[in-house]
Amino acid sequence: MDKLAIQASPPLAGDVIISGAKNAALPILMAGVLAETDFIVSNVPNLRDVSTSCKLLRCLGADVDELGNGQIRISTKNLNEFCAPYDLVKTMRASILILGPLLARYGTADVSLPGGCAIGARPVNLHLHGLEMMGAKIEVKEGYIKARVDGRLKGAHIFMDMVSVGATENLLMAAALADGETVIENAAREPEVIDLANCLIAMGAKITGVGSATLRIQGVERLQGCEYRVMPDRIETGSFLVAAAVTRGRIRCLKADPASLESVIAKLEDAGAKITTGEDWIELDMEGKRPKAVNIKTAPYPGFPTDMQAQFCVLNVLAQGTATITETIFENRFMHVPELIRMGANMELEGNTCIIQGIESLSGAQVMATDLRASASLVIAGLVADGKTIVDRIYHLDRGYEHIEQKFQGLGAHVERVQ
């Protein structure tokens, strides 16, 4: 099984090209099921979850051609299966996003209950409740969600009990082909939801309120394929910016989207980083200084993203001062903390809050990745730890970061993939 071997590295320096956003690409690929003609998606990152999504679409009978250069073409003319099996779904929670498109277009869907990162209860009840309000008959048995609808789904007024990105996306796709108007209140406002909505609009969907907490979808009878470019990955961007801050370096992230990262940029500036942005680039310069501790509380967008919490734990571990990090989105999302403590970090957990006293340096150790973003934090810690750090189980990392070791090497880091 692959590992990453990391030696203490100089301050990161240079340019890094940001990949397409995994969390936008996955729902957009699933939206291909809604299109009656060929659908071409570009800027798709080369990741394990993307490969799983393509396998899932092929398993349903869709023709999926990887055209190279991050382009994927999807044709549904031969789609004739409506079951997303356990062996595919267990590795990727986003497989649940096939439910809305299959049900809306074909009236039937059997989807295994999902797997993915082990970061707490991420219930699918919001997805199911919304679809039931649109007229679907759903039962959960033998580990599968079995959903049926006679004719078309019906427009409905849906209030989400809690903000859920996945449920918003599933219901948005389902509503695009429903009969009548659907209103989704307390909808997620994440940039990836906006990207999916813009893709659906390019396919012919009628959606208003994009980017707000109230989405209105006037269902249409059919959607056509289009060509659509996936937005840049804001979490990958943020991860490299934090790595540069921790190593006291200076980097530029190219093909990025500064507008989607305002809360992260604000916290990096609080930590002492000098940040300059253009339309599609972000430059961070620590001017050789140690970062200052910053308090973090995760929240749905436009608040601070839970997917950047682990990386800021590392920043605070090596910062001047004391900080608290409070996780409000997922429970069980501090699994990186025991690993960082093994490297010498001074941190303790109290419920959903981590209290961190900054120290000057860490020691290299063998550590284990437990989920996608935790693994990124361990890599960043390894860059500034004395000696050698080995990160095990990096298949988590490969689910969300494209060519991570090559990108770090390009910035001067001593990172290599080993068996």
From Swiss-Prot:
It is an enzyme of class 2 (transferase). Keywords: Cell cycle, Cell division, Cell shape, Cell wall biogenesis/degradation, Cytoplasm, Peptidoglycan synthesis, Pyruvate, Transferase. GO terms for cellular component: cytoplasm. Its EC number is 2.5.1.7. The keyword Cytoplasm applies. It catalyses: phosphoenolpyruvate + UDP-N-acetyl-alpha-D-glucosamine = UDP-N-acetyl-3-O-(1-carboxyvinyl)-alpha-D-glucosamine + phosphate. Pathway: Cell wall biogenesis; peptidoglycan biosynthesis. Phosphoenolpyruvate binds at residues 22-23. One of its GO terms (molecular function) is UDP-N-acetylglucosamine 1-carboxyvinyltransferase activity. The keyword Cell wall biogenesis/degradation applies. It is found in: Cytoplasm. Its main location: cytoplasm. GO terms for biological process: cell division; cell wall organization; peptidoglycan biosynthetic process; regulation of cell shape; UDP-N-acetylgalactosamine biosynthetic process. The active site is at 117 (proton donor). UDP-N-acetyl-alpha-D-glucosamine binds at residues 93, 307, 329. The modification 2-(S-cysteinyl)pyruvic acid O-phosphothioketal is found at residue 117. HAMAP family: MurA. Belongs to the EPSP synthase family. MurA subfamily. Cell wall formation. Adds enolpyruvyl to UDP-N-acetylglucosamine. This is UDP-N-acetylglucosamine 1-carboxyvinyltransferase. It comes from Shewanella sp. (strain ANA-3).
